Amino acid sequence: KKNKRSGKVENVGYLDLEQDEEQSRCSLYFYGDIVSATWESMWYEEDRCPQDIADFLNQLDGYEDIDIYFNSGGGDVFAGLAIYNQLKRYDGHKVGYVDGMAASIASVIMFACDELHFATGAQAMIHKPLCMAYGNADDFKAVIKQLNLCEDSILDVYMEHVQEGVTRDKIQSLMSNETWFDSKKMQQYFNVEIEEKAAVAACASDFFEKYNNIPEALKGIDTKDIVDAVIAELENRNNAAAEAEKQRIEAEKQQILDDLYLYGM
């Protein structure tokens, strides 16, 4: 994307970015896991961290509308809350599309959108935040306190988007039971629009093994095939880049030879 301040074309935080100059709209994709640091998101191009989103938003004018697409199995809860707040503060109109899945913290991020569309067959999942910890009893008490605070923050987000009559206790119960929603069930509890289109291909996530009630349709995903396809695509990109660089060098060599010939050398 061309940076409107510097005029340079830049890689915007490893994000897939499309821009419609006439309508002043951009597209942002969450098609991988939510991670805490840039070095983690560099391992897999589809993963996202808060700094990626900051880089993305910093290159917009602050009023451009954003279409945000979701097919994510979730990830780091603090990174996800940071991304939610970044997007929530952004002044442009944000339209969210759950194409395949918005699980765990990804289901929080999607509610940063001003309007939300749910594809027929798409899935969402809400649950209590979880973590790994070690230490003494005091350390674990501190972790429990932090998890409860996170749960309250997540509940606050969900409650801003529930249907009339849905109580906080009900959403908290659904979180405790790790509840998966199809598009129809999602609309029973939350203010979302259902789109008459099929969900996209299955999402590969490192966080599936941490969930308890994964729908049968998701259990059969062969993530190895997906990883192999991603690796093959990256290799193709690297080969294409290497070939382009080779052609550039050859062109420069030819230009030098032509200049030497022009001056009789």
State what each model feature region is:
Residues K1-I105, C113-M265:
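N-terminal organellar transit peptides
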